[in-house]
């Protein structure tokens, strides 16, 4: 939407202030983000959740009562976050690749 100041600046041949340009671009980005997210309906999220659980359940036993799937938005990026507590692998034990991050997790699991 063009303000009176923008109209006068345009008629006088002045450039639009960078703040106004930045604001207009931000509004377009926000509108674009809202449109993209609106396509993720509850039914679609439920279907994705079920399919993810079906695939993971082929390899590990999941604690279905503790499963949490959510959408999280940060810095204009939306992520599907799935917290799937694993009881054990299908063959009976949980195996981890040893890394700094999993080192503590392995110690906690063995307790």
From Swiss-Prot:
Protein keywords: Cell cycle, Cell division
Superkingdom of origin: Bacteria
Keyword Cell division: yes
Protein name: Cell division topological specificity factor
Function noted in UniProt: Prevents the cell division inhibition by proteins MinC and MinD at internal division sites while permitting inhibition at polar sites. This ensures cell division at the proper site by restricting the formation of a division septum at the midpoint of the long axis of the cell.
Pfam family, one: MinE
GO biological process, one term: regulation of division septum assembly
Gene name in the database record: minE
Family indicated by similarity: Belongs to the MinE family.
NCBIfam families: minE (TIGR01215), PRK00296.1 (NF001422)
């Amino acid at each position: 939407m063009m303000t009176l100041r923008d109209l006068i600046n345009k008629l006088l041949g002045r450039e639009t202030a960078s703040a106004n340009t930045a604001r207009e671009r931000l509004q377009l980005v926000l509108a674009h983000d809202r449109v993209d997210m609106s396509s993720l309906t509850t039914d679609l999220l439920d279907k994705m959740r079920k399919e993810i659980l079906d695939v993971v359940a082929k390899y590990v036993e999941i604690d279905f009562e503790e499963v949490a799937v959510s959408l999280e938005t940060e810095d204009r990026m939306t992520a599907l976050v799935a917290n799937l507590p694993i009881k054990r692998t299908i063959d009976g034990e949980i195996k981890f690749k040893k890394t700094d991050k999993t080192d503590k997790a392995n110690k906690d699991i063995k307790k």
